[in-house]
Amino acid sequence: MRSLTLAALLLCSLLLVFHTSAAAELEAQEGHLMIPGDTDTALETVDDERFFECTFECDIKKEGKPCKPKGCKCKDKDNKDHKKCSGGWRCKLKLCLKF
């Protein structure tokens, strides 16, 4: 039992050393570590706005279909009231979700 515990500790130590050295190498190559929130802030804001817009304006009847505004039964796409939630938004689980 002791040998199994010792082997597990040794393996974890090696993985930690490998991970640390790989991170240091990437930092040296890039000059800095990339922080995910830095570049996605503008896109995240647009996605949040689109999510709320779609959630409140959509009449969800069929799963997987494009989200459509409530009360719009016309097929005239030139009508300004006939908006679609575009950009990958679909009705799933009674919500408009981006895919």
Curated annotation (Swiss-Prot):
GO terms for cellular component: extracellular region. SUPFAM superfamilies: omega toxin-like. Disulfide bonds join 54-67, 58-91, 72-74, 85-96. It comes from the Eukaryota. InterPro entries: Hwtx-2-like. It holds the Pfam family Toxin_20. Residues 1-23 form the signal peptide. The keyword Cytoplasm does not apply. It is found in: Secreted. Keywords: Disulfide bond, Neurotoxin, Secreted, Signal, Toxin. One of its GO terms (molecular function) is toxin activity. The keyword Cytoplasm does not apply. Residues 24-50 form a propeptide. Expressed by the venom gland. Belongs to the neurotoxin 12 (Hwtx-2) family. 04 (lasiotoxin) subfamily. Toxin that causes irreversible contractile paralysis into adult Aedes aegypti resulting in 100% mortality after 24 hours. The primary structure of the mature peptide is identical to that of U1-theraphotoxin-Lp1a (Lasiotoxin-1) from Lasiodora parahybana (AC P0CC18) and U-theraphotoxin-Lk2a from Lasiodora klugi (AC P0DRD8). This is U1-theraphotoxin-Lsp1a. It comes from Lasiodora sp. (strain IBSP 8539) (Brazilian salmon pink birdeater). The lineage of its organism: Eukaryota, Metazoa, Ecdysozoa, Arthropoda, Chelicerata.
